[in-house]
Amino acid sequence: RQRQMFIRDRTKADTKIKPGCIIEKIDGTNIKSGEDYYPLLSGKAGKQVLLSVYDPATKERFEEQVKPITYGTQSDLLYKRWVEQKRQMVDKLSNGKIGYVHVKGMNSESFRDTYSELLGRCREKEAVIVDTRHNGGGWLHEDLAILLSGELYAKFTPRGQFIGNDPFNRWLKPSCVLMCEDNYSNAHGFPW
């Protein structure tokens, strides 16, 4: 049974497959109950695969062409979904007042992502949750500590019109860091 679907671009999604549908065949090969169907997808990432599907809700059988993804791509999609769910939860529970940023790794790419989220999407928030859970480590602790420890030293308000603060490139508001037991190395030490 199809339990979940990952659609990367909903504007391009044109499928009858939905949770609850049963995939009966892959490229014409029957899938027996309890049988491992993974070998039928081996080496087919990014290639067209024909699925024969049964929808028990409508009693309809149909076929659809799909392109399977790699395990790495699946992991990335699951991660992005998890982050978006946490962001939406924080936004809902705080009535839009608190931002959420996840630091995936303690490396340059993660720092750029964190910086962009924090000083972009979260800039107007009253506070931010910086989530370091499930982080594999790296060398970012000092950069993150500096980014989160900004202190306001100037406000620019010419003729009564507020246009910004200094420092502009550091977080000036309250922050809360989340961590967990599987943070590794630098990610484990950062919150201390």
Task: Indicate where each model-derived feature is located.
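Residue-level "contact hotspot" at macromolecular interaction interfaces
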Residues: R10-I17, N30, S42
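Short, small-residue-biased leader/transition segments that mark boundaries at the very start
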Residues: Q2-I7
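Structural motif
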Residues: K18-E24
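Serine-centered coil/turn micro-motif
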Residues: R8-T11, G138
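Cleft-lining beta-strand/loop regions that shape enzyme active-site pockets
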Residues: E24, T29-W192
